[in-house]
Amino acid sequence: MHKIIKNVYKGTKPMQNCLIIINKNAGSSKKISFEKVEKCLGDDYRYKHCTIPDDEIENFSAYDAVAVCGGDGTLASILEKACDMPLKVFYFPVGTLNDKAKAERYSHLKAKCPSCDEEKGKAKPIVVGKCARLIEEDGYITEECDKSLFSYVFAAGSFTPIGYTSDVKEKQKFGALAYVSKVVEEYKPHRIKATIATDKKTYDDEFSLIMFLKSPRCFGFHFNKAYNGESMSGHVLAIRSPKHKGALGYIEMFFPFFRAFFMGLKKERDKGSLIFKKIYSANLTLSEDVDFCKDGEKHVLKKGRYKISFRRSLCDFCVIEKF
């Protein structure tokens, strides 16, 4: 009798629910379709479709998996909802630069297709960055409940507005070239008054760039040669503002940016205008409101004190580039 029951139920699995989200404003969204995603993920799921910006993204509690089709900013917004949930997140990168997907090529998370390449297709938790406002009451410092997550970069200053100011239609038509016209426009020193406190040292200065990073690349440059995808750490890259203003300041800012992004960074550095440190967490104090670029989307940090840290997700994550 036991044998018969075993045979009856052998190989049967309950259908799981999967929400497919396609951002129609993503740079190369025309490459993807609901049919392609369903074909890739297979027959184990019962699918529901959602498009951005037409539909409101619902709570994921009714789903076992979420397929995200968009760019890095789309992924970050979905991870904020899914990070602490026991579900699978399949990322189909159809953005413009797709830096997060390219970063995963340097880890063990990349997959061709979870249904046809089982070994590579096993989704795993990932390490994400977290920015939380610190509040001091009665001598105690606590984190605000409303936290912001980023999948690979959280940065402010020179060049960072390119990620969120480029025109959607231009990105869809010209791809990464849409950013080129913005480079000259955004080549200018910034003077962000801030204090960056790591576990070893505190930097109180004016900065042209402040970047918290969990990636080997950003801006399309593969420069962070110290990247370790499995580690619970990330990096902070800070470039001090030029000492001079005007034309001399523009010339002065060229050298540390060239050193960081074109020559790359393999070891920690604290020399001249350039700071590059491995961190598990760091405190950031801003003297004024600052516009940050969070995975390609604009995110305003109000004047105050914040904690940047890194944590492992509860959800499992997988990049699918071939579909």
Regions found by a protein language model. Give the residues of each.
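ATP/nucleoside-binding phosphotransfer catalytic cores, i.e., glycine-rich phosphate-binding loops
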Residues: G229-S231, S241-F323
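Short helix/loop capping segments that flank catalytic or ligand/cofactor-binding pockets
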Residues: S29, G220-F221, C293, C318
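Short polybasic amphipathic segments
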Residues: I126-R133, I192-T198, A282, D289-F292, ...
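Small-residue-rich beta-alpha loop regions that form the catalytic core of phosphotransfer
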Residues: I4, V8-Y9, P14-F174
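ATP/pyrophosphate-binding catalytic subdomain of soluble kinases
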Residues: T142-S241
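Short, well-ordered alpha-helix to beta-strand connector turns
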Residues: Y63, P86, E206-F207, S233, ...
